Amino acid sequence: MGFINDCFMLKNDEAKRLYHEYAEKMSIIDYHCHLSPEQIANDHVFKNATELFLGGDHYKWRLMRAGGVEEKYITGDADDYDKFAAFASVVPYMIGNPMYHWTHLELKRYFGIDEVLSKDTCRPIWNKVNDCLKKPEFSTKNLILRSGVTVLCTTDDPVDDLKYHRTLKDWSVKVLPTFRPDKI
């Protein structure tokens, strides 16, 4: 068993009771989502682990750069597996950064993977994630629904077209735009 389990970060009996009796069952309001509204509206199916974990995630890119990874493996034209392997090679050095826990929570929660992602575990994790992504329950909307999300706020430029938000207005998850003026 890996370090991510049903009582991860719950250090005493009261914390475990409060979480499992109350918080665990509550819906999630995601105020800062990196999925594009277009991906959600089109129920995008991720082609592989690189697209899912690294596509557009500038936080992971920053950690890869800090770990000395060449840009071609981050936003460049390297092969997708090589990009994922480059990410895996820096994950062990992320201890102390929330991204370390988030990465392993994602692997455990959605893919049942207990192993720590590293250069040594990269290939079997890549294969398992990619096998899962072929199944309908791993489409964008299904991943959101499986997460218990009821409100999801996308990060949008002030001039973005809201057409995809409009197409999602009748979906069970409320998808709202937020103001992110990075390009200004």
Each language-model region and where it sits:
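Metal-cofactor-binding active-site regions of metalloenzymes
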Residues: 2-184
